[in-house]
């Protein structure tokens, strides 16, 4: 209820703009030389980001600030036209920004089984990377084991043409069968591991992370 207070200093976007975002450009350029594709987490912060005053005890004391948005990304692609990015855009506010640059979005299946899937056929868009879960999620088996409404997930998978006898295997199969350009599956999901294989528990410090 208090949000996540990370304690990170904010970027001085006014100064970075004067330098043609050189700080970012150099880092993106280097990473682009050693990796085929980059994943940008918290992409929404280029649109708006949550600013918390120094010394705050919780994140509730912050406010939304406009990010550099199109000006920043125009500069990035002018200087690095070959840059390939996957962007974490789990909120609808940044879909227009993502689509303007034809970027691959992230579709995390654990987050995408909601009320809407009761009304329309479940579908992963082509211009995306599908994940069963990320490093912040529980392994797929743990997630499914702890669900209250397992029958709903089973119904969704049956509607997609699967038998529904092994729902976890159906979800894994759909990740590879769907229209997404890339499927990204954690190894613990492929091996069928549960709670014992979780690698991170957000907002905590301990053996998980």
Give the residues covered by each predicted segment.
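Alpha-amylase-like alpha-glycosidases and glucanotransferases acting on alpha-linked glucans and related
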Residues: 1-184, 188-190, 194-195
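Low-complexity, glycine/alanine/valine/leucine- and proline-rich hydrophobic stretches
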Residues: 191-209
């Amino acid at each position: 209820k208090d949000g996540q207070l990370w304690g990170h200093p904010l970027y001085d976007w006014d100064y970075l703009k004067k330098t043609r975002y050189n700080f970012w450009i150099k880092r993106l350029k280097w990473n682009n030389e050693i990796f085929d594709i980059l994943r940008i987490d918290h992409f929404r912060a280029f649109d708006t980001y949550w600013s918390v005053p120094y010394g705050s005890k919780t994140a509730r004391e912050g406010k939304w600030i406009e990010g550099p948005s199109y000006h920043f990304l125009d500069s990035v692609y002018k200087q690095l036209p070959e840059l390939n990015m996957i962007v974490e855009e789990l909120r609808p506010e940044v879909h227009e920004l993502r689509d303007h640059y034809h970027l691959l979005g992230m579709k995390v299946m654990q987050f995408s089984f909601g009320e809407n899937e009761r009304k329309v056929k479940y579908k992963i868009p082509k211009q995306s990377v599908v994940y069963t879960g990320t490093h912040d999620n529980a392994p797929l088996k743990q997630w499914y084991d702890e669900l209250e409404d397992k029958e709903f997930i089973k119904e969704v998978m049956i509607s997609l043409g699967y038998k529904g006898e092994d729902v976890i295997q159906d979800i894994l199969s759909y990740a590879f069968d769907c229209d997404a350009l890339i499927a990204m599956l954690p190894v613990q999901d492929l091996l069928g591991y549960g709670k014992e294989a979780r690698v991170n528990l957000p907002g905590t410090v301990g053996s998980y992370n």
